[in-house]
Amino acid sequence: MPELPEVETIKRTLTPCLREQKIARVEVYHPGVIAAPDPETFSRLLAGRIITGLDRRGKYLLVHLSGEYCLVVHLRMTGRLVFTEGAAPLAPHTHVVFSLAGGPSLRFVDTRRFGRLYLAAKAEVETLPGLRDLGPEPLDPAFDALALAAILAGRRRPIKQVLLDQRLVAGIGNIYADEMLFAAGIDPRRPAASLNHEEVARLRGAMQRVLEQGIANRGTSIRDYVDGSGRQGSNQEHLQVYGRTGRPCPRCGQPLERVRLGGRSTHFCPRCQV
């Protein structure tokens, strides 16, 4: 699933391509990916609108439009948003095409069809399911060690599961949770409330470094992810623990281990992470 760095990269690659572009028409090939309104109304309301900018909130992409509407995209597991010049053939699993004035298009492609598109009034975007309950942005300067400590206080769940809870912190998924816990030297199975002040500060710093590295490397392409231009990211070449079960820890040489936490594979070093 695209996480914060991937959605941020998509936003940054699409913004110069889409800003001030006019949507000429919208073709929906698989109605199930349109969450709201109905596909016919979705297409009709989008036609003729100007794209004024893009934002990200957690793992959601917000496409701001002229008038009173905003397009909200949640890519889920395998969704892609790709800007395409000219009349290139449709890729397999293309479900929505936003044709832009002058010939280019924005295409929503999703192998598993879990992704969802919403067209909502701007005043109602923050009340959409999923968005309304999102926690703070981990790269927000206001999200400091004190803010993280307040989230962890009193929580007995494993720290890994707390980091994945979008209601507590927005945008973190399985890959980056494993990487930031390794960077901080914290066992993912530890109760969140057991972290002391020094460990919380260390984790806060690791969160920022790991997420910023993911963005600098244009995201992690392990299976489906590509950016808004259709290019893969390179952060998979820099992963320290995720997907490296049995290989030597890059820090101490101990074989890395994998366990299941909350139904998710979790990768860590049994020696370095305590």
Swiss-Prot record:
Active site as annotated: P2, E3, K59, R264
Tell me which InterPro entries the record gives: DNA_glyclase/AP_lyase_DNA-bd, DNA_glyclase_Znf_dom_DNA_BS, Formamido-pyr_DNA_Glyclase, FPG_cat, MutM-like_N-ter, Ribosomal_uS13-like_H2TH, Znf_DNA_glyclase/AP_lyase, Znf_FPG/IleRS
Q: Where are the zinc fingers (FPG-type)?
A: 240-274
Reactions listed under catalytic activity: Hydrolysis of DNA containing ring-opened 7-methylguanine residues, releasing 2,6-diamino-4-hydroxy-5-(N-methyl)formamidopyrimidine; 2'-deoxyribonucleotide-(2'-deoxyribose 5'-phosphate)-2'-deoxyribonucleotide-DNA = a 3'-end 2'-deoxyribonucleotide-(2,3-dehydro-2,3-deoxyribose 5'-phosphate)-DNA + a 5'-end 5'-phospho-2'-deoxyribonucleoside-DNA + H(+)
Annotated binding of DNA, by residue: H93, R112, R155
Its BP terms in the Gene Ontology are: base-excision repair
Q: Which PROSITE patterns match?
A: FPG_CAT (PS51068), ZF_FPG_1 (PS01242), ZF_FPG_2 (PS51066)
Q: Which cofactor does it need?
A: Zn(2+)
Role of this protein:
Involved in base excision repair of DNA damaged by oxidation or by mutagenic agents. Acts as a DNA glycosylase that recognizes and removes damaged bases. Has a preference for oxidized purines, such as 7,8-dihydro-8-oxoguanine (8-oxoG). Has AP (apurinic/apyrimidinic) lyase activity and introduces nicks in the DNA strand. Cleaves the DNA backbone by beta-delta elimination to generate a single-strand break at the site of the removed base with both 3'- and 5'-phosphates.
Record PANTHER family: FORMAMIDOPYRIMIDINE-DNA GLYCOSYLASE (PTHR22993:SF9)
**What is the protein's name according to its record?**
Formamidopyrimidine-DNA glycosylase
Organism encoding this protein = Moorella thermoacetica (strain ATCC 39073 / JCM 9320)
Its organism's taxonomic lineage begins at: Bacteria, Bacillati, Bacillota, Clostridia, Moorellales
Give me the gene this protein comes from: mutM
